[in-house]
Design a protein with these regions (language model features):
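Helix-to-loop junction immediately C-terminal to a conserved catalytic motif
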Residues: 71
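Conserved ABC transporter NBD signature motif
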Residues: 79-92
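Conserved ABC ATPase "signature" region
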Residues: 132-150
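Conserved ABC ATPase signature
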Residues: 154-158
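Catalytic Walker B motif of ABC-type/P-loop ATPase nucleotide-binding domains
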Residues: 179-182
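H-loop/switch region of ABC-family ATPase nucleotide-binding domains
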Residues: 214-215
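Conserved beta-strand-loop-alpha-helix hinge in the C-terminal portion
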Residues: 233-260
C-alpha cells in the first residue's frame, strides 16, 4: 500500500498539491552564503517524483546546506526553490514531506510507546477522538516498517535504527510520499542499516521520492537511481550529477565503505502489510 493510500485510509488533506504534475524539488540558480562566502552558487537541481537520489560529499562540501535549502530550512541568498510546484516559502502541504534528521530528539524525554508516536500523526486540533480509519493507518504504517510487534514498547527501548523506522512510520501515517534523510545510517549497526534499506526499497517500489544526504551510500547503493557529489564551495560545488556509480576519481570517499558490506539481499517480504 502506497504512502498516500495509508493517509487516505482516514482522511483527505485539505489544500494538498498535485505532486504528480510537478517535480518533488526544483532549485533554480540557488545560492547560499555563509560568513560572506558562497557555500554554493548558480546551482540548479530538479528531483523528480519517484527518484531515489543521494547527495554525497565530505564534511564542509555543502551537502547538508543544499538539503536544508531545498526544504526551506536554510534561506537562499539568491535564486528560487520549489516543492511540488510551490515556492518553498509558501508551501503548506507538509503532510507530504518527511524530514528525518541525523540526530533525533531524546527518546527518553517523555515516556511514550511506539504506537502512540505513530498515532500522533493522525491527530487534528478540531477532533477529540481518533477514528478506526486513523488507527488502521497507524497499524499499516508500523507493519510497513516491520515494527508492529514492538508497538507497545517505549520508544526509548528501541535501537537508533528502529527509532528512525518509527519516525518513517509516523511520516507514512500522516501521508508523506517525499522522504528526506540526513545521514540515515549514522551510529547504527549493519543489521539495522539493512533493515532500514529494506524499508526504503519498499517505499521506492511504492513510488515515493527519497533524497538522502550521506558520506557514503553503503547499503543504499543498490537503491539509488541518482548520485549528486558535492566537492566544495562556489559555482563548481557539484562535481557529479548522474546515475551511480560516480566517476572513480570522485568516488574514493563517497563509495569506499560501500564495498565493506556484503551485497544487500533482495527484499525479504517482511515489509508487506
Amino acid at each position: 500500500m502506497a504512502a498516500r493510500d495509508l493517509y487516505d485510509a482516514g482522511m483527505t488533506a485539505a489544500g494538498t498539491t498535485d505532486g504528480g504534475a510537478f517535480p518533488s524539488f526544483h532549485l533554480t540558480n540557488g545560492q547560499v552564503d555563509y560568513e560572506g562566502e558562497a557555500v554554493f552558487s548558480h546551482l540548479s537541481l530538479t528531483i523528480q517524483p519517484g527518484e531515489f537520489a543521494a547527495i554525497l560529499g565530505e564534511n564542509g562540501s555543502g551537502k547538508t546546506t543544499l538539503m536544508k535549502a531545498l526544504l526551506g530550512l536554510t534561506p537562499l541568498s539568491s535564486g528560487s526553490s520549489q516543492i511540488v510546484g510551490v515556492d518553498v516559502g509558501r508551501f503548506r502541504d507538509w503532510t507530504r514531506v518527511a524530514y528525518v534528521p541525523q540526530r533525533l530528539l531524546s527518546a527518553g524525554a517523555v515516556p511514550v510507546s511506539v504506537l502512540e508516536v505513530v498515532r500522533s500523526a493522525r491527530t487534528r486540533p478540531n477532533r477529540l477522538f481518533m477514528g478506526n480509519a486513523d488507527k488502521t493507518a497507524a497499524e499499516l504504517a508500523l507493519r510497513k516498517v516491520n515494527l508492529w510487534g514492538r508497538r507497545h514498547d517505549r520508544l526509548d527501548a528501541l535501537s537508533g535504527g528502529q527509532q528512525r523506522r518509527v519516525m518513517i512510520a509516523h511520516a507514512l501515517a500522516k501521508g508523506a510520499d517525499i522522504f528526506v534523510l540526513d545521514e540515515p545510517t549514522a551510529g547504527i549497526d549493519h543489521e539495522s542499516q539493512r533493515q532500514l534499506a529494506d524499508v526504503f526499497s519498499a517505499l521506492r517500489d511504492d513510488g515515493a521520492t527519497v533524497l538522502l544526504v550521506t558520506h557514503e551510500l553503503g547499503v543504499f547503493s543498490r537503491l539509488a537511481t541518482r548520485v549528486i557529489v558535492m566537492q566544495g564551495r562556489g559555482a563548481r560545488s557539484v562535481a557529479y550529477d548522474g546515475p551511480p556509480p560516480a566517476p572513480a576519481h570522485l568516488a574514493d570517499h563517497a563509495w569506499h565503505h560501500s564495498n565493506e558490506l556484503a551485497p544487500l539481499p533482495e527484499p525479504s517480504g517482511l515489509l508487506e502489510p
